[in-house]
Amino acid sequence: IIFIELILNFTITGIPSTSNRDAYVESNEAFKQLNEAAKKDADADGVKFYRSEQLSHRTRNDGALFKYNSISTFSSVSSAAIEDYFTSIGLQTSFNAYSSYGITPLTAALFSLRYEYSTGDTSFPSESSLLSSASYMADGNNQTTLNIYKYEKSLPLGFVINSSTMSEWDLSGSDPFTIQNSLVTTAISGGSTI
């Protein structure tokens, strides 16, 4: 009986619900072209390290799949401290993955997020500009354009911050905007309202 149930379950849910591998690799060449455009742009600006993100993820590891440095990642050895930090500032987390979903201009800058891939608009139109585009065939016959946008206000990988800012930054609470605002007010005005 168990064997019959396994066969029926696999036949009903296993085969029809699997994804075609082509859906994962059809845009690889477009990403390769745009990754090269990002590297060339970063090199021209003297930037050695930066991160990129995709507006809408296909997997939890798009950075690894499409070969770009990403905030979003899946790892079976994810740190609970990083998960807590991401959650407190409003980014999506689960017990073994972190995502850029929920990113704001401030968190994008803090994480050195310099480029964003999108088949439409960017997350922050007033803070970014179109760098390049590449086309590919989606689903075998639909022409799709992938854009890469450059954030104009990205911070470098390392930057100096007053030690009192870190000790006074209030990461408690459930509102990520209050927590982000706490960082800014603590860094700029020593915690006074601005």
Regions found by a protein language model. Name each.
Residues 28-32:
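A structure-centric feature marking long, well-folded core domains of fungal metabolic enzymes
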Residues 107, 112-194:
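Flexible, solvent-exposed extracytoplasmic
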Residues 33-43, 103, 135-138, 147:
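Intrinsically disordered, low-complexity boundary segments flanking structured domains
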Residues 2-25, 37-111, 155, 161-179:
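Extracytoplasmic/lumenal acceptor-recognition loop(s) of multi-pass membrane glycoenzymes
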